[in-house]
Amino acid sequence: MYRIIRKEQFSPRVFLFEVEAPLIAKARKAGHFVIVRTDPHGERIPLTISQADKQRGTITLVVQAVGVSTNKLAHMEVGDELADVVGPLGKATPIERFGTVVCAGGGVGIAPLLPIAQALKAAGNRVITVLAGRSRELIILEDEMRKVSDELIVMTDDGSYGRKGLVTEGIASVIEAEKVDRCFAIGPAVMMKFVCLLTKKHEIPTDVSLNTIMVDGTGMCGACRVTVGGQTRFVCVDGPEFDGHQVDFDEMLQRMRAFKPEEEEAMSDYQHHFDHLDTPPAPPAEAAPVQTVESRVEAVETTPSESDPAAEALNGSRDDAWRKALRTSLKPKERMAIPRVEMEELAPEIRAHELRMEVNRGLSVEQAQREASRCLDCANPGCVNGCPVKIDIPHFVKCIESGRFQAANQVLRATSTLPAVCGRVCPQEKQCESQCIHHKTGSAPVAVGYLERFAADYARLHPVAASADVPERGEAKGKVAVVGSGPAGLSFAGTMCQRGYDVTVFEALHEIGGVLKYGIPEFRLPNAVVDHEIQTLRESGVRFVKDCIVGKTISIEALEQEGYEGVFVASGAGLPNFMGIPGENATGILSSNEYLTRVNLMDASSALSDTPAPEGRHVVVVGGGNTAMDSVRTALRLGAETATVVYRRSETEMPARVEEVKHAREEGVRFLTLHNPVRYITDEAGHVRQVELQEMRLGEPDASGRRRPEPIEGAITRLDADLVIVSIGVSPNPIVPHAVKGLELGRKGTIAVDDHMQSSIPMLFAGGDIVRGGATVILAMGDGKRAAECMDEWLSERKG
């Protein structure tokens, strides 16, 4: 799809590639960049777009081979295809008629400077270009730059070409000769730093384009954060261009060295292999797969017979003979007396070292049927009211009790797109199970989540037909789009497909699944489970498009022009939240989004992956939610000697599921509650070494109903840490909200919707984190289902 059609070599390590990417070529403006992946194991690397040809549908990238991923790219040839190209990303360069403008480019920074110089010249500016490099071979695109410049100066460190000297000397000569109104500088961070020191002295406004560490490139991970004017900014969404006089270059340089040891080791291994081969090295052999819950179940579980057809159970009601007979087979007191099932778990001493072995092992047939027999099949089931997607819980539970396991799965899928997912990660104890009638007698509720997982897993592992999981599709109605493939988007897609719509899901990342893939570790939610649910949607008719950012690659207006009658925005979590305390941008401090994305989506802990994994001996995770538990438990599995959760309230107020806290503690996680970070202490290299903590006490309840934490004056302590993972929530993804004119926004940048999930733009509906600011999987799914129902009604009314 992203085929290389031209390659040029400027120097031993600098290459130009022209790549087919028609949508990006059409949308690209000066200043934009893309994220590129060479192969399935490749790192996501940011590259600024040098040129674009809308007619040919191509973009031009200039690359310097410095690490494994860029060396892999350098070894690709015309005709080869890149695995992924995502963009255009970032903000376009603000172009005005400034007057006299100096464009200063160093090394490969000349490539992204070219379209800026072209745009400045077209806007009527006098453009003076200063190109700089260590030697002549690093002066690239000179002829192209000369065409758009009124004057061009070449500087080389060694004097091998042009004038001998640094880029700042060339700029200084221009400043001495005439008045300069603006400066644009792109190149190595050190170069830009000294250019800005010079121009600040002369009070010349200066824009710099920053190329920082990135993972996703859409703002979700926070790896690209920099300090600008004393505030934390995200290069991929707020930049890449900033006021150079406000940038903390020293901090940026420290952060860019975050993975230098890992990168040097990886490059050494790559070069060692390459020196002994005529072609780039093949990836190492796959390690033997760990035993998954699927292989264990398939090895020991047999398929019980289902004497009654699934259709009878699926289409029935509480008053059907089979359910009446089931209810009378045991007295209510007998059902209430059965103890709640305990699911088998991997032993803590084993699972704490297994990143991809699922902790909860599932129920056996006997366990599932016995647990299902605890359900009283209530006439007015509170559990259904507690379910955000309104699953007919008694119905599917009774199907399990009677041995109709396939029917149980079909009952689930009639209202839920992701039953195998929800059965694993949804907080049933706060939703359906919290409304169970068992609570009235003081006994434990029916294990609805365990049973939901059992039914979905059983159907997946014992398929009776190719379309067993595919719900019946309604009469063809129209064409709708979904932005994002997380739980809200998938739920919407499944529901609309059932109702007869042609559904296309646009996903920014290279994997479908959103937070289900990048955010939740496999020891809680195996990828195979998510992939099966996605495949079920594909088989039902849902189309998926990866590497496409609605609002960047393609606009809402363009979707409407292509015949999409409605758009559901489920773009999910955007910018990770940070506390804004001293030292927070130090090396070794990451957001949970970045940490989990590296490990889960990019498989950074694998020898096959080019993405470096953040590792620490003493890991501190700040926060008390499920994402914090996922992060701290992952850190243990990657070899941390100590893993500590720091939370400002008590354990009672923790939003994480009780089960997740229990599992974390069993695995050796330490909990330091009623403490809050106030400062990070670093070494001379800028790497975090300690967390300074303020001891807290609980005061009166706040708006959330939880008691407000208050600092205890003078109670300060320190905790050793060489890796800190900040997990204190997220802000909505800003790309779509900022890309749609006239779209009404809510508090903190969420999309404002009415009770029907409809925004101020009638064709645009929204749900999940982009509306709530933060939601569980099942709440997001509930939004998706509700939005689908309402959009269907709205579209039907429009058509009469």
What are these regions (language model features)?
Residues N585-G616, P701-G774:
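FAD-site-proximal beta/loop scaffold in flavoenzymes
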Residues R134-D143, D502-V505, L509-S540, F544, ...:
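Rossmann-like dinucleotide-binding cores of NAD(P)H-dependent redox enzymes
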Residues V480-T504, M629-L636:
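N-terminal Rossmann-like FAD-binding beta1-loop-alpha1 element of flavoenzymes
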Residues G474, K479-V483, D531-I581, R679-E692, ...:
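Feature captures the FAD/FMN-dependent oxidoreductase FAD-binding
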Residues P240, D248-R296, V300, E306-G474, ...:
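Ferredoxin-type iron-sulfur electron-transfer modules and their immediate structural context
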Residues V68-V215:
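FNR/FR-type flavoprotein reductase catalytic core
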Residues M1-D80:
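Ferredoxin-reductase
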Residues A455-G474, H532-K552, P576-L638, L745-S760:
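Glycine-rich dinucleotide-binding loop and its adjacent helix/turn
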